Amino acid sequence: MAAVREVGSKAELEAAAGGARAAAVHFWAAWCEASKQMDEVFAHLAVDFSHAVFLRVEAEEQPEISEAYGVTAVPYFVFLKEGKTVDTLEGANPASLANKVAKLAGPASVAESAVPASLGVAAGPAVLEKVQEMAQQNGASATSSAEDALNKRLEQLVNSHPVFLFMKGTPEQPRCGFSRKVVDVLKQEGVEFGSFDILTDNDVREGMKKFSNWPTFPQLYCKGELLGGCDIVIAMHESGELKDVFKEHNIPLQPQGSKNEEAVKAKPDTEKSGAVSEPALLTAAQKERLESLVNFSTVMAFIKGTPEEPKCGFSGKLVHILKQEKIPFSSFDILTDDEVRQGLKLLSNWPSYPQLYINGELVGGSDIVMEMHKSGELKKVLSEKGIVAKESLEDRLKALISSAPVMLFMKGTPDAPRCGFSSKVVNALKQAGVSFGAFDILSDEEVRQGLKTYSNWPTFPQLYYKSELIGGCDIVLELEKSGELKSTLSE
């Protein structure tokens, strides 16, 4: 059997791959079961394609190499020709691995007639046997991995451009009237945008419906947040709000010189969009009504839709933050009253929505509130104004520890652990059938350091049951080994 070579440094990898016509690199981790399974497939492929170079890198032990090749999860494969990356693969997909190796290295040494069409010419009998074994043993985990991979792909698509449109067809050839209308709006706004034709990929088409909780297409995103479909985009365009949203998020708008746009510019003032740019004034009655609304509640959110059913991603983000901070607030749906929608832009001198007010004073839109939330400034402002009681670190830790009967403080999330020890504890809890809450200590340094003192336990992960510390990774694994884990967490 041709050996898969373990690589211990970036220089060693570059030397091995640089001198080879074709090289495949497997980034793996000892704690990852999927890595072990894919490593067997990788080893069999090394036999079938003995004229190529096969290398292994333990991702966590070689951070310099992992960072150089953009590795954020395992198993991960990089395919190189003469030292240059030509393709990659993330996740446990033996069929894809076999096909990518075949494409990289050329025909295998096995007879093509022995290989099913589903794997192309990539795999020999040993690989096929391993694929079948993995399919039988890991059907459920493969489905989960596929869903995770799809969600990651969707997130990458949504964030690939500041403005991104999921549509039927292409901007040059829309395949439905609604998609055509949104493309026309974006062109009139003079904004550059990326797009994806959902007719070419049913996984993306169906996945986006769940991802966005929006059942139809087109779907327009700005800075990763859903603005809405055709009707909402057209309404925002006609009111001038779409342009305001782009400006608020520092998205450049290109001046358009077409005849159509000259005609738009020549329209009477009454037909122009963008209320803020007009020299209109509020009447005394309008101003009184708006001031009454912004002071209706101590914390007042002007959003599209309702807190239960936000009608745009930015409004949804704001509502989520307020709920996460446990801030009591009232709201007003600006889609139900255009006089309020346009008038509040003038009163606040703020061109877009949502808008958050505290004690009648404008705090800002979703981006500003998000930054304040991340930095802790939002809670500080609310505490200073007496809206929420100032929470001590100890109180916060107690609240977090008691937020679930079984609570795990870990690096990363249960779906994407960021260290081997955290991954082992997550796997142990899942195998024991224990439901648990989790907190990513990498997301909050104050919690990370505070919990060490509070629990008198210096490392992570830390597992709690009914607010009492059970222990770290070693203790959890001992309980699992002795069969006591589930009973300990259900007494």
From Swiss-Prot:
GO terms of biological process kind: intracellular iron ion homeostasis
Alphabetical UniProt keywords: 2Fe-2S, Cytoplasm, Iron, Iron-sulfur, Metal-binding, Redox-active center, Repeat
Primary location class: cytoplasm
Physiological role: May only reduce GSH-thiol disulfides, but not protein disulfides.
Descriptive protein name: Monothiol glutaredoxin-S11
One MF term in the entry's GO annotations: 2 iron, 2 sulfur cluster binding
Binding site for glutathione: K411, R448, F460, C473, D474
Domain of life of the source: Eukaryota
Cell compartment(s), UniProt: Cytoplasm
Ligand binding ([2Fe-2S] cluster): C419
Pfam families for this protein: Glutaredoxin, Thioredoxin
Keyword Metal-binding recorded: yes
Domain Glutaredoxin: 151-253, 287-389, 394-491
Family that this chain belongs to: Belongs to the glutaredoxin family. CGFS subfamily.
Listed Gene3D superfamilies: Glutaredoxin
Gene: GRXS11
A single Gene Ontology CC term: nucleus
Natural source organism: Oryza sativa subsp. japonica (Rice)
